[in-house]
């Protein structure tokens, strides 16, 4: 649960940390049945934030790759690996909190 809530307090200047925590939440939200449209919308906001925080194209590319990797691992956890798979009730609550914060801050796609 700590990792899920860390997206709101991720180091503002660290696009890779934002990518990892954001993708962890979004991947798990997708796994838990949150609509593709909602996950995509939140992902677009997070990717935009990553782009604006990145110092250069290389940093943006690294963060983007981490986002893609972490999302895939969270959305489709392998049964044979020991991975953190939070309960869907927690994931959906945190995802809804993220959506609310995005709306309050005026973030759009």
What are these model-predicted stretches?
Residues 1-6:
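Bacterial N-terminal signal peptides
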Residues 41-109:
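Compact alpha-helical subdomains of small soluble proteins
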């Amino acid at each position: 649960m700590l990792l899920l809530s860390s997206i709101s307090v991720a180091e503002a200047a660290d696009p890779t940390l934002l990518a990892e925590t954001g993708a962890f939440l979004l991947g798990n939200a997708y796994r838990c049945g949150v609509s593709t449209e909602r996950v995509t919308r939140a992902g677009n906001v997070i990717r935009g934030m990553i782009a604006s925080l990145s110092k250069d194209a290389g940093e943006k590319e690294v963060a983007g790759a981490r986002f893609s990797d972490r999302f895939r691992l969270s959305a489709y956890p392998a049964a044979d690996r020991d991975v953190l798979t939070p309960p869907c009730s927690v994931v959906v609550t945190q995802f809804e909190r993220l959506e609310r914060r995005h709306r309050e801050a005026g973030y759009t796609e």
